[in-house]
Amino acid sequence: MPRSLKKGPFIDLHLLKKVEKAVESADKKPIKTWSRRSMIIPDMIGLTIAVHNGRQHVPVYVSDEMVGHKLGEFAPTRTYRGHAADKKAKKK
């Protein structure tokens, strides 16, 4: 279920401070964060945010279509390497 509108979007305060600082200084350097649960707000448009996926920080360039989604949606945590090939087919 989506979050109630009267509560507003959730964003960690430490991330919000970093975003505000980057916007006022027009800094294009990626903002490193572990907060996958924070929602993308309109102030983040045009910034690059490096979201942690459990192993490394994945750079995510924020566009206007991403507003309202969570940062973690754009940094996958699992890598799919495909199913094992059929061993019977390889022997022939």
Curated annotation (Swiss-Prot):
Q: Per its database record, what is this protein's job?
A: Protein S19 forms a complex with S13 that binds strongly to the 16S ribosomal RNA.
Which InterPro entries does this entry report, sorted A to Z? Ribosomal_uS19, Ribosomal_uS19_bac-type, Ribosomal_uS19_CS, Ribosomal_uS19_SF
Q: Which GO terms describe its molecular function?
A: rRNA binding; structural constituent of ribosome
Name recorded for this polypeptide = Small ribosomal subunit protein uS19
Q: Which family does it belong to?
A: Belongs to the universal ribosomal protein uS19 family.
Q: Which UniProt keywords apply?
A: Ribonucleoprotein, Ribosomal protein, RNA-binding, rRNA-binding
Q: Which Gene Ontology cellular component terms are annotated?
A: cytoplasm; small ribosomal subunit
Give coiled-coil spans as residue ranges: none
Query: A GO BP term, please?
Result: translation
**Which PROSITE patterns does UniProt cross-reference here?**
RIBOSOMAL_S19 (PS00323)
